[in-house]
């Protein structure tokens, strides 16, 4: 693998380094530079933990031990070595001094270093070559198999006579617009954009060569028996799992709070769904499915009551559970596996939002695939994970994890037929490489350090929001964070702090089982004044859409907007600067709101797009929208529409077949009640399907759609989106329904 000049860092404690030793270091640095390495001048390290996190681009570290080092210096040395090894177990570490010997140095330090350099023994030339060799070995070991093969291929300079047609990027250089594209994305990305004709890279579709090696290495990292990279997101991973396991007429257990890809899989396979119903608070946050819903006896009762299941004795083929929910509710996966083992053939945990759980003890037992826990006896276990969501994969990077049961093994031939069905024969190799690298980043102590840092930053943000709120004068307002009533204690999070219990009220859920769920602290719901979790509106309020539009205009884009909340993710890429900038913008919004500054000043771009708001004060705009929400009782309406399961008139696959064969008609909202929908009807927010194809529209749902239409008419720019809701030529909102 080719690489640019190696970088060697020199560091020392806070005690001064003598003149002669400084001169020896300078000679060694000069020799390293002669060999092509970048030698960074000695850094005096006061905070070893912070320094350790700056070394990701370094190939080797030399720690300088001053003359006549005593116990105090050895204490600094111990702390330095511990800090390095806490984040990187492999980085070569050498000690440099005048008369260093193993007899003098602490044993815990000697265990962690590659060598000791005495300044006046070997020549600087020899020592430089030794360091260069160790640094090179380290860098050569860094790249996992597929990424190494891809970079080698891109660097070889081979002419491309295969697709893609841009031929390593040269086609772009034949056009002015194409040149802009080339300049933006760069040579490496375009040279590595190849097709499956390049045999030395292996085959994603057949899981051979370097691809297979990297998948096997990632499986070891994530504790799985098998792991497969997927390049079209976890939507595709879910469909692969389903098409490998589910057939027409199979009984399937599905979290009603599932991603739409699961509902698409139901339509594709012709399965008969039985839904497990989650709780929900009046602020619009989706809660957990009660423990009772997983009871095999309760599942059997639902099978008995289902009108489309003829043979009531059949075993459900698959369970799919959203783990975690969008808002961060995580289930006790170990308990669910024990409860349903043998009662369902396949246990599938959609962990699109939980790929990090394996790497920190806070989540022990809360993720599906775990080689440190007992296997299931009979039920095969899958987890589908979006490595692009919370880890470092590029968009669409996903993976499928499989854990065999004691008496049930994955049939790789059947699985790969489903994999082929849903995977492009022209996958994007940069996405494969990002799957490879994001898994490698989580390997060893580095993965734990990354997740611990994300948790720590999220906790610091939560503490900061709570502290600022506590410091506001009585009667003044500030933002909140949805979470335990007691502010997070200093230090790392404890599981018990984040477990949901029936005695707590902060979550707002009616039915909570002790020891069954927790809130993931890195998923932060920032709340605005105006609505409680019990659905009570305040006299005034700040709707979430106003705040999110303000923040977006000022460079802060959030993950999701609720009625009176914003959802933000503390991924492994979040920094102190980023979340402190968010807090600064929240302060600025508060100042503008309190002064009732005109919208055209507070949000000029939004005012240009929607001039009807330009001369309104920011507080006045919030008051008007809040009054409308309150008048329509929108919080309780948007909760109630999800509480009762609609009547099932057709199986989803049959309703979809009516759509594809043209046996549908587009029905206006006022005429919808009692009709059978042919499409998924999904309001955003929250993005949870309200109706599945084949279900009858209720009066309450019609009322909700009318209210949404009225709000959109009254407040253009602040309307939500309902997927599945169409618009006729005359502007009437319609839904595609099955002809009866």
Enumerate the language-model features and the residues they cover.
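Short active-site oxyanion
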Residues: 92, 225-227, 249-252
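Short beta-alpha junction loops
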Residues: 14-16, 68-69, 95-102, 121-123, ...
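Two-component/phosphorelay signaling modules centered on CheY-like receiver
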Residues: 15-45
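Non-catalytic signal-transmission and effector/linker regions of two-component phosphorelay proteins
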Residues: 1-8
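Conserved PLP-enzyme active-site core in the AAT-like
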Residues: 45-48, 53-56, 78-82, 106, ...
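Conserved N-terminal alpha-helix of the aminotransferase class I/II PLP-enzyme fold
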Residues: 188-236
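Short acidic, S/G/P-rich loop/turn micro-motifs used as interaction or catalytic elements
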Residues: 14-23, 66-76, 99-102, 325-328
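Non-catalytic terminal extensions of PLP-dependent enzymes
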Residues: 6, 25-28, 34, 46-63, ...
């Amino acid at each position: 693998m080719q690489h640019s000049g190696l970088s060697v860092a020199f560091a020392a404690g806070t005690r001064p380094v003598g003149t002669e030793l400084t001169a020896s270091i300078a000679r060694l640095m000069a020799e390293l530079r002669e060999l092509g390495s970048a030698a960074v001048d000695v850094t005096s390290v006061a905070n070893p933990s912070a320094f350790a996190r700056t070394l990701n681009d370094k190939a080797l570290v030399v720690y300088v031990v001053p003359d006549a080092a005593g116990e105090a210096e050895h204490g600094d040395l111990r702390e330095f070595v511990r800090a390095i090894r806490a984040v990187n177990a492999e980085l070569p570490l050498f000690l440099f001094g005048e008369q260093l010997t193993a007899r003098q140095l602490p044993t815990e330090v000697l265990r962690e270093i590659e060598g000791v350099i005495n300044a006046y023994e070997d020549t600087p030339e020899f020592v430089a070559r030794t360091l260069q060799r160790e640094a090179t070995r380290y860098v050569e070991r860094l790249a996992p198999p597929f990424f190494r093969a891809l970079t080698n291929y891109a660097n070889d300079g081979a002419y491309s006579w295969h697709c893609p047609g841009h031929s390593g990027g040269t086609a772009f250089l034949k056009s002015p617009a194409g040149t802009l594209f080339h300049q933006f994305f760069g040579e490496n990305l375009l040279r590595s954009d190849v097709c499956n004709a390049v045999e030395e890279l292996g085959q994603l579709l057949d899981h051979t060569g370097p691809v297979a090696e990297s998948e096997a290495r990632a499986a070891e990292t994530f504790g799985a028996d098998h792991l497969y990279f997927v390049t079209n997101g976890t939507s595709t991973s879910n469909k692969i799992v389903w098409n490998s396991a589910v057939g027409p007429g199979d009984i399937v257990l599905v979290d009603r709070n599932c991603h739409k890809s699961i509902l698409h899989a139901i339509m594709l396979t012709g399965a008969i769904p039985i839904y497990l119903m989650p709780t929900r608070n009046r602020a619009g946050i989706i809660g957990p499915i009660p423990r009772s819903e997983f009871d095999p006896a309760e599942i059997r009762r639902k099978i008995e009551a289902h009108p489309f299941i003829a043979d009531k004795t059949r075993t459900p083929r698959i369970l799919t559970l959203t783990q975690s929910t969008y808002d961060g509710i995580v289930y006790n996966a170990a308990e669910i596996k024990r409860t349903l083992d043998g009662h369902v053939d396949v246990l599938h945990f959609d962990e699109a939002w939980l790929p990090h759980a394996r790497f920190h003890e806070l989540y022990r037992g809360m993720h599906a695939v775990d080689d440190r826990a007992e296997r299931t006896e009979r039920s095969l276990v899958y987890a589908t994970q979006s490595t692009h969501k919370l880890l470092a994969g590029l968009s669409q990077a996903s993976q499928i994890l499989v854990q065999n049961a004691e008496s049930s093994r994955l049939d790789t031939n059947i699985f790969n037929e489903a994999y082929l069905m849903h995977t492009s024969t022209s996958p994007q190799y940069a996405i494969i490489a990002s799957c490879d690298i994001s898994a490698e980043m989580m390997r060893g102590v580095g993965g734990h350090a990354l997740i611990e840092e994300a948790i720590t930053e999220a906790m610091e943000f939560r503490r900061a929001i709570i502290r600022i709120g506590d410091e506001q004068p009585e009667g003044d307002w500030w933002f909140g964070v949805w979470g335990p009533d007691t502010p997070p204690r200093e230090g790392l999070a404890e599981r018990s702090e984040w477990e949901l219990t029936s005695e707590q009220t902060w979550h707002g859920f009616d039915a909570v089982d002790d020891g069954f769920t927790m809130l993931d602290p890195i998923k932060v719901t920032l709340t605005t004044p105006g609505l409680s979790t019990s659905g009570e509106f305040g006299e005034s309020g700040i709707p979430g859409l106003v705040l999110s539009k303000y923040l977006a205009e000022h460079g802060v884009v959030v993950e999701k907007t609720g009625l009176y909340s914003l959802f933000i993710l503390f991924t492994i890429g979040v920094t102190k600067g980023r979340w402190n900038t968010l807090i600064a913008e929240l302060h600025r919004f508060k100042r503008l709101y309190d002064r009732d500054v005109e919208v055209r000043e507070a949000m000029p771009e939004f005012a240009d797009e929607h001039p009807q708001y330009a001369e309104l004060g920011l507080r006045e705009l919030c008051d008007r929208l809040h009054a409308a929400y309150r008048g329509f009782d929108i919080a309780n309406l948007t909760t109630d529409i999800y509480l009762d399961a609609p009547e099932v008139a057709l199986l989803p696959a049959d309703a979809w077949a009516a759509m594809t064969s043209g046996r549908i008609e587009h029905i206006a909202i006022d005429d919808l009640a009692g009709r059978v929908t042919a499409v998924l009807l999904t309001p955003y927010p929250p993005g949870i399907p309200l109706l599945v194809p084949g279900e009858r529209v209720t009066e309450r749902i019609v009322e909700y759609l009318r209210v949404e239409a009225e709000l959109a008419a009254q407040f253009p720019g602040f309307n939500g989106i309902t997927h599945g809701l169409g618009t006729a030529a005359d502007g009437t909102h319609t839904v595609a329904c099955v002809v009866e």
